[in-house]
Amino acid sequence: MNEDITPKKPNAIIEWIDYRLPIFSFLKHFSHYQTPKNLSYLWNLGSIAGIALVIQIITGVILAMHYTPHVDHAFDSVERIMRNVNYGWLLRYTHAVGASMFFAAVYLHIARGLYYGSYKAPRELLWHIGIIIFLTMMATAFMGYVLPWGQMSYWGATVITNLFSAIPLIGESIVTWLWGGFSVDNPTLNRFFSLHYLLPFIIVALVMLHLVALHQHGSNNPKGIDVKSPKDTIPFHPYYTVKDFVGFGVYFIIFAYFIFYEPNYLGHPDNYVPANPLVTPAHIVPEWYFLPFYAILRAVPSKLGGVLLMFGSIFVLFLLPWLDTSKVRSANYRPIYRIAFWIFMTDCLLLGYLGGQPAEGPYITISRFAACYYFFHFLVALPLIGKYEKPLPLPEEL
């Protein structure tokens, strides 16, 4: 008996909607999207970061329903969430740990891009949008850290906003404008709460733009070579959706461990003390994901110099597609760059450690050397390596 292979007629309602709003065609494009066939699990990190963003938005919206953005009630409202709101402790810990997990995924995502040359032509704008997302994440996380209104929240806000006073002529006016007064107080807290609620949705818009740029030229791959024929690609679904779910499983196991066993491991105990403008903590430190930049900030005696270097350490990433002069993308075929990459990763970890230490003695001295190497890697090493390195022969196909 012959099987009827006549194609099914599309649902009339779906067809009517899709003709006017092509969401079903868009979903079909995603499932049939051709990707390089040799992507490793490191390419899961983008999807993991997307899941982390969704978790942050959902938990953040629910927490905002119970939070009171007032200096007299903010700390108490957070404690009320922990004690009186059904599963409030779970929501808060998921949101707090989720921020760290989000940054961990994004840092690994950036590191993968650095290793495999994902910033090189024709993906420069894809890289730039990614760095803008990273900057927006940093602003969102900083404002969120202020909201519990503990000691570290208050003094962290005071220290970081005071950095703008280093700007000649207009710095003091900018700080007063940011504070909404002459010190960190209720107007500051309200502004930070409002912006902390808004910025994640801006991140979502930027992520959509990031995906549009990604689909224009497709994903990079471990070999760093362009796709030359259809046999070099496979559909995203089901091959990479299944792979993504494996990554999600590992991610959620680590996530759950921190939520249920070490929820405060990545935080600071001083933030469980209500904010007191009259008592300065012995050691003011930001969250762990800001520590490398904090170490660079403190490495320079001049406030203006420290601020310029701190922001410069991020903005230098925008110049990366042109600073790296090599025509080869992947570090797998660049023996000298591969060594430089791992030295740079070690330097970043060292800066992270130094940022969490007191600003005294050998810590400051080592921070200066580490900060110098950070900029040396981008501004000196990369252009010279690209010019003089002899890369290994590239394969003809994936």
From Swiss-Prot:
InterPro entries: Cyt_b/b6_C, Cyt_b/b6_C_sf, Cyt_b/b6_N, Cytb/b6-like_sf, Cytochrome_b, Cytochrome_b_C_euk/bac, Cytochrome_b_N_euk/bac, Di-haem_cyt_TM
Binding-site residues, heme b b562: H95, H196
Cofactor(s) required, per the database record: heme b
GO cellular component: plasma membrane; respiratory chain complex III
A Pfam family per the record: Cytochrome_B
Keywords: Cell membrane, Electron transport, Heme, Iron, Membrane, Metal-binding, Respiratory chain, Transmembrane, Transmembrane helix, Transport
Membrane topology, record value: Multi-pass membrane protein
Residues annotated to bind heme b b566: H109, H210
Gene Ontology molecular function terms on file: metal ion binding; ubiquinol-cytochrome-c reductase activity
Membrane-crossing residue ranges in chain numbering: 45-65, 96-116, 129-149, 164-184, 192-212, 245-265, 304-324, 339-359, 366-386
GO BP term, example: respiratory electron transport chain
Keyword set includes Metal-binding: yes
Xref: SUPFAM superfamilies: a domain/subunit of cytochrome bc1 complex (Ubiquinol-cytochrome c reductase) (SSF81648), Transmembrane di-heme cytochromes (SSF81342)
Subcellular location(s) of the protein: Cell membrane
Primary localization class, coarse: membrane
Co-factor remark: Binds 2 heme b groups non-covalently.
Family: Belongs to the cytochrome b family.
Summary of the function given for this chain in its UniProt record: Component of the ubiquinol-cytochrome c reductase complex (complex III or cytochrome b-c1 complex), which is a respiratory chain that generates an electrochemical potential coupled to ATP synthesis.
Annotated PANTHER family: CYTOCHROME B
Further comment: Heme 1 (or BL or b562) is low-potential and absorbs at about 562 nm, and heme 2 (or BH or b566) is high-potential and absorbs at about 566 nm.
Subunit and partners: The main subunits of complex b-c1 are: cytochrome b, cytochrome c1 and the Rieske protein.
Protein name: Cytochrome b
Organism expressing this protein natively: Rickettsia felis (strain ATCC VR-1525 / URRWXCal2) (Rickettsia azadi)
Lineage per the UniProt record: Bacteria, Pseudomonadati, Pseudomonadota, Alphaproteobacteria, Rickettsiales
